[in-house]
């Protein structure tokens, strides 16, 4: 079942989430601040759902920061919200809408 996006947004607005070690290292490598993640979630939309992910049910959210930086954020479902990874989508892997994966 896809997550309730409003509930996810509430967790992020209240800073009631964790970053996995992987997400934390990726955010540092990619110079993505927590505030930017929160901004992107607040305006974002779920573009992929992973109900059977090996780390537990999660989804991929696409959103923009206030500076218009596009981010993809994979996050687990509530009640224990964790960011699994975060990145700027690449035009090599994503269509121009940033929602659709390119197929090889």
Predicted regions, residues:
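Ribonuclease/tRNase effector modules and their secretory precursors
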Residues: 1-104
């Amino acid at each position: 079942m896809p997550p309730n996006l409003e509930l996810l947004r509430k967790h992020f607005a209240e800073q009631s989430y964790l970053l996995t070690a992987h997400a934390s290292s990726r955010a540092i490598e990619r110079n993505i601040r927590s505030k930017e993640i929160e901004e992107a979630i607040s305006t974002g939309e779920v573009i992929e759902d992973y109900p059977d992910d090996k780390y537990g049910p999660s989804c991929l959210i696409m959103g923009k920061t206030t500076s218009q930086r596009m981010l993809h954020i994979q996050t687990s479902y509530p009640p224990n919200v964790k960011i699994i990874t975060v990145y700027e989508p690449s035009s090599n892997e994503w269509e121009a809408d940033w929602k659709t994966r390119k197929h090889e």
